[in-house]
């Protein structure tokens, strides 16, 4: 059994800030735990817009605080995301999150991430493996 407090991750390599400056993420469960998924608490900042495409991962997101507009870039459809709303990127959809109010969410990835990932120029997380 693993029990963790978010406070223990402050100032460690499990607390990641994006190169773009639009988000920060606490990587709670990673590939090295060998449970088949990873879990993150992520905050996207108000007034930012982040385009993403998880070509190598499936992601489920649950909003716990904040307000954002999610756009499916393949269909053009938009969704208002507020606390208690979940979205699942089960088709590797290219999407953009336009944040109106700091957006706090819990994210689950499969396959699990290592914690070193950041979005590339296409908004993709590379498929990294755990270093041995």
Curated annotation (Swiss-Prot):
In which pathway is this protein known to take part? Amine and polyamine biosynthesis; ectoine biosynthesis; L-ectoine from L-aspartate 4-semialdehyde: step 3/3
> What EC class does the entry list?
lyase
Which InterPro entries does the entry link to?
Answer: Ectoine_synth, RmlC-like_jellyroll, RmlC_Cupin_sf
What are the protein's UniProt keywords? Lyase
Question: Which is a Pfam family this sequence falls into?
Answer: Ectoine_synth
Q: What is its EC number?
A: 4.2.1.108
| One BP annotation, GO | ectoine biosynthetic process
One GO molecular-function entry: ectoine synthase activity
> Gene3D superfamilies given for it?
Jelly Rolls
Q: Which SUPFAM superfamilies match?
A: RmlC-like cupins (SSF51182)
Q: Does the keyword Repeat apply?
A: no
Kindly state which reaction or reactions the protein catalyses. Answer: (2S)-4-acetamido-2-aminobutanoate = L-ectoine + H2O
Tell me, in a sentence or two, what this protein's role is.
Catalyzes the circularization of gamma-N-acetyl-alpha,gamma-diaminobutyric acid (ADABA) to ectoine (1,4,5,6-tetrahydro-2-methyl-4-pyrimidine carboxylic acid), which is an excellent osmoprotectant.
Q: Which family does it belong to?
A: Belongs to the ectoine synthase family.
Q: What is this protein called?
A: L-ectoine synthase
Species this protein is from: Streptomyces coelicolor (strain ATCC BAA-471 / A3(2) / M145)
Gene symbol here is ectC
């Amino acid at each position: 059994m693993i029990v963790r407090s978010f406070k223990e991750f402050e100032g460690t390599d499990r607390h990641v800030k994006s190169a773009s400056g639009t988000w920060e993420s606490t990587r709670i469960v990673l590939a090295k735990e060998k449970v088949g998924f990873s879990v993150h608490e992520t905050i996207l900042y108000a007034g930012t817009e982040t385009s993403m495409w998880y070509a190598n991962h499936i992601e489920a997101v649950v909003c716990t605080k904040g307000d954002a507009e999610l756009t499916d870039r393949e269909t053009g459809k938009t969704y208002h995301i507020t606390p208690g709303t979940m979205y699942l990127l089960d088709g590797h959809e290219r999407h953009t999150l336009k944040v109106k109010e700091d957006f706090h969410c819990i994210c689950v990835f499969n396959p699990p991430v290592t914690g070193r990932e950041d979005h590339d120029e296409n908004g993709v997380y590379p498929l990294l493996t755990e270093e041995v």
